[in-house]
């Protein structure tokens, strides 16, 4: 008979609070979120994947048909629904932080900013530019720099900032697990 592994000791201290991964596009939120959820015995949700599933089309097409404002409205609706659930690691879209009303939901959980830094982000995006609607311009680097400057102070509102480099997602997940206790109440000692 297979026994499931014991839950991570942090799971109880988290008290079911969702962990929201924020950061620029290509910062590794989805790839890090899966192993993080697995380590904590949490569920995993990618808001972009949920939006694509609900809309029945890929995000670039949603941007083309609905515009950024329409997409952001869908994103907020999805976040509202996710916020009703608990014990989730949530990979958010890069612009999730741009709507002030989203922060009310994000701050009900723990907000974790994955920050690879500008150069690494642009390198990753350059390799995947076709799937990034906000970079479909004459000068993608200038568009990126503008977005980066606009969003940086918003990401800085996160509860935890995690500098990431070339580590594998599993390693980044472990780094988050090592840093999370500084945000949590000490474990409760039970008598008896």
From Swiss-Prot:
Pathway: Metabolic intermediate biosynthesis; chorismate biosynthesis; chorismate from D-erythrose 4-phosphate and phosphoenolpyruvate: step 5/7
Keyword Metal-binding: yes
Reaction(s) catalysed (UniProt annotation): shikimate + ATP = 3-phosphoshikimate + ADP + H(+)
Membrane spanning residue stretches: none
Entry keyword Amino-acid biosynthesis: yes
Name of the top EC class for this enzyme: transferase
Pfam families named among the record's database cross-references: SKI (PF01202)
Cofactor(s) the protein requires to work: Mg(2+)
Binding site for ATP: 26-31, 132
PROSITE patterns, per the entry: SHIKIMATE_KINASE (PS01128)
Residues annotated to bind substrate: 48, 72, 94, 151
Co-factor remark: Binds 1 Mg(2+) ion per subunit.
Highest taxon of the lineage: Bacteria
InterPro entries listed in its UniProt record: P-loop_NTPase (IPR027417), Shikimate/glucono_kinase (IPR031322), Shikimate_kinase/TSH1 (IPR000623), Shikimate_kinase_CS (IPR023000)
Keywords: Amino-acid biosynthesis, Aromatic amino acid biosynthesis, ATP-binding, Cytoplasm, Kinase, Magnesium, Metal-binding, Nucleotide-binding, Transferase
GO cellular component: cytosol
Main localisation: cytoplasm
EC number(s) from the headed UniProt entry: 2.7.1.71
Oligomer status and interactors: Monomer.
Role summary: Catalyzes the specific phosphorylation of the 3-hydroxyl group of shikimic acid using ATP as a cosubstrate.
Protein's recorded name: Shikimate kinase
